[in-house]
Curated annotation (Swiss-Prot):
This is DNA-directed RNA polymerase subunit beta'. It is an enzyme of class 2 (transferase). DNA-dependent RNA polymerase catalyzes the transcription of DNA into RNA using the four ribonucleoside triphosphates as substrates. One of its GO terms (molecular function) is magnesium ion binding. One of its GO terms (cellular component) is DNA-directed RNA polymerase complex.
Length: 678
């Protein structure tokens, strides 16, 4: 077996019978070797204990309870002073019960059986390696016909094979009837070969290097012939060349991995550990078993039925033996791959049995679901939608998901606040969705970040941390700027949410994984949280303003004698029918909320003197003088009021409400960023 502390990789391949025995065999103190499963039984119906030498035998697979044998005796696990290591009465080893997750057994087959993956899967490795049609091998494996051995010294009727092929074909079903079991074995071993044993002999005979050389020579000869002028023949030659290439690659693979081709025929059938094919007791005392157990039982029944006449009986007809070998082959095929290129086997409720191939392949198979990816607790999954009102570091969790993810924390809060006396009452309050539950949930979520992950996670920005808040609905809300880091779109994409439990995980999420801490691409350093699509359109509409410019209106805002453009004086702003003046951005936004001005209407906003906006070489468009000596220099986008001594009294900039809103958002973001790092 593979040591999990030393090996970081896994290779899957065919196994020799010696290795299968080494995995399963154990030697008892009395010298008895155990490991072979010989009985098709599981548990005794009275004692509810595993049957000896059955599919759940404690001698073969280990004890059900750690350190307790089948007799009920107890030994301390790992104590070298405790002796013996095996129970003298039942032969069960005193070890941890977890051994039943990896301790294997085996079934000794009465006849060789081809592995259905290598025979019926396309392309068929056996047919490719031996360069014969697949139908011939299927007929040979399932005992539909036999072939003569070339080394027969005392032929009986097969010497007539060349001349009387049709006659022999008509008698192939009647000839075995004249032989008893012993006589048929002698006849078959001497002159004919059938079943998987015939395949095994053919796989063991040829040299792989000779196969490679002959195939390469034939491929070169076909390539030198060129086109024949017949399209059908050319296609046939092309298919033959492709087949030879596959055959060469297959032979080289066997040579490179040092695997013997005859391993594609099974003599020993491994039995999975019991914990991987469990029998579970459900409500009402009923038992629910894995389908693989039933398929193993079927194999053992048929194998024992074949073993009995081969070892004891001397009068069983040879036809019966061949028929039973076919049944064993079909039982093993069903165990390994039920329904491969045929009708699957079903139970009494017309349900298809789940074979070993069904357990390991597909999205819900052992590899993709359990080994390559695992389902974990404290996690959920839902569709993502835009949350435009969210902060960059926040995400919206639906109430249904949040109460499940933080249920244990809510239960602890209910018990601490003496709202519930135990876990059962707390869960009932959560099911009833009482108001106190949502209050405690919000308190828990305030100090607990969550991790959002979108598959495939190709770089570190594929999983980021957020501060969750409760939202209505069933979708996860996200700030649109974090979309690019996840490579997500709001068109039905789904994301997984995880809750970091340990303090170390929470600290890592806060310091390294928060979305506002990952604004730059880790590969090239460019900003990755940049506005796109509708965000750019919104910013464009917000800041486009009125493009007429200041020269489009020759109105003098400081001329109080102009009766057509009256000004309304107020403590905070001066408003005209043309372009109003405001002392602060808050006054301008207040006027917009009161619908006195539009989003893109030009206005004059008083600016701070410490923030200079004057270009060094810019010349004013117009200069206006007042009677008190002050004058106004009007530029394209700002206005300066100066005293008689040319001192700047105040500055007004020409802007819009959209520009003011955009500026305030950026200013608040920068101030918040500075406070976070101060």
């Amino acid at each position: 077996m593979i040591d999990r502390y030393k090996h970081q990789q896994l290779r899957i391949g065919s196994v020799s019978p010696q290795q299968i025995r080494a995995w399963a065999n154990k030697t008892l103190p009395n010298g008895e070797i155990i490991g072979e499963v010989t009985k098709p039984y599981t548990f005794h119906y009275k004692t509810n204990k595993p049957e000896k030498d059955g599919l759940f035998c404690e001698r073969i697979f280990g004890p059900i309870k750690s350190g307790i044998c089948a007799c009920g005796n107890y030994r301390v696990i790992g104590d070298e002073k405790e002796d013996p290591k095996f129970c003298e009465q039942c032969g069960v080893e005193f070890v941890d019960s977890r051994i039943r997750r990896y301790q294997m057994g085996y079934i000794k087959l009465a006849c060789p059986v081809t592995h259905v993956w290598y025979l019926k899967r396309l392309p068929s490795y056996i047919a490719n390696l031996l360069d014969k049609p697949l139908k011939e091998f299927e007929g040979l494996v399932y005992c539909d016909f036999s072939f003569a051995r070339p080394i027969a010294k005392k032929p009986t009727f097969l010497r007539l094979r060349g001349s009387f092929e049709s006659e022999i074909q008509s008698r192939k079903y009647s000839i075995p009837l004249f032989f008893t079991t012993q006589g048929f074995d002698t006849f078959r071993n001497r002159e004919i070969s059938t079943g998987a044993s015939a395949i095994r002999e053919q796989l063991a005979d040829p040299d792989l290097r000779i196969i490679t050389d002959h195939s390469l020579v034939e491929w070169k000869e076909l390539g030198e012939e060129g086109s024949t002028g017949n399209e059908w023949e050319d296609r046939k030659i092309g298919r033959r060349k492709d087949f030879l290439v596959r055959r060469i690659e297959l032979a080289k693979h066997f040579i490179r991995t040092n695997v013997e081709p005859e391993r594609m025929v099974l003599c020993l059938l491994p039995v999975l550990p019991p914990e991987l094919r469990p029998i579970i007791q459900i409500d009402g005392g009923k038992l629910m078993s894995s389908d693989i157990n039933e398929l193993y039982r079927r194999v053992i029944y048929r194998n024992n039925t074949l073993t009995d006449p081969l070892t004891t009986s001397t009068s069983t007809p040879g036809e019966s033996v061949m028929c039973q070998e076919k049944l064993v082959q079909e039982a093993v095929d069903t165990l390994l791959d039920n329904g491969i290129r045929g009708q699957p086997m079903r139970d009494g409720h017309n349900k298809v049995y789940k074979s070993f191939s069904d357990v390991i392949e597909g999205k819900e198979g052992r590899f993709r679901e359990t080994l390559l990816g695992k389902r974990v607790d404290y996690s959920g999954r839902s569709v993502i939608v835009v949350g435009p009102s969210l902060s960059l570091h926040r995400c919206g969790l639906p109430r249904e998901i949040a109460i499940e993810l933080f249920q244990t924390f809510v239960i602890r809060g209910l018990i601490r606040q003496h709202v519930a006396s135990n876990i059962g009452i707390a869960k009932s309050k959560i099911r009833e969705k009482e108001p106190i539950v949502w209050e405690i949930l919000q308190e828990v979520m305030q100090g607990h970040p969550v991790l959002l992950n979108r598959a495939p996670t190709l770089h570190r920005l594929g999983i980021q941390a957020f501060q969750p808040i409760l939202v209505e609905g069933r979708a996860i809300c996200l700030h649109p700027l974090v979309r690019k880091g996840f490579n997500a779109d709001f068109d039905g994409d789904q994301m997984a949410v995880h809750v970091p439990l340990s303090l170390e995980a929470q600290a890592e999420a806060r310091l390294l994984m928060f979305s506002h801490m990952n604004l730059l691409s880790p590969t090239i350093g460019d900003p990755i949280s940049v506005p796109t699509q509708d965000m750019l359109i919104g910013l464009y509409v917000l800041t486009i303003g009125n493009r007429r410019g200041i020269c489009a209106n020759r109105y003098n805002p400081w001329n109080r004698g102009n009766s057509q453009n009256e000004r309304v004086n107020d403590t905070n702003y001066m408003y005209t029918k043309k372009e109003p003046y405001f002392c602060s951005s808050s006054d301008a936004l207040g006027a917009y909320r009161q619908k006195r001005i539009n989003l893109d209407s030009p206005l004059w906003l008083r600016w701070r003197l410490d923030q200079r906006v004057i270009a060094s070489r810019e010349v004013p468009i117009e200069v206006q003088y007042e009677s008190l000596g002050t004058y106004h220099e009007i530029y394209g986008h700002y206005l300066i009021v100066r005293s008689i001594k040319k001192e700047i009294l105040c500055i007004y900039i020409r802007t819009t409400v959209g520009h003011i809103s955009f500026y305030r958002e950026i200013e608040e973001a920068i101030q918040g960023f500075c406070r976070a790092y101060s």
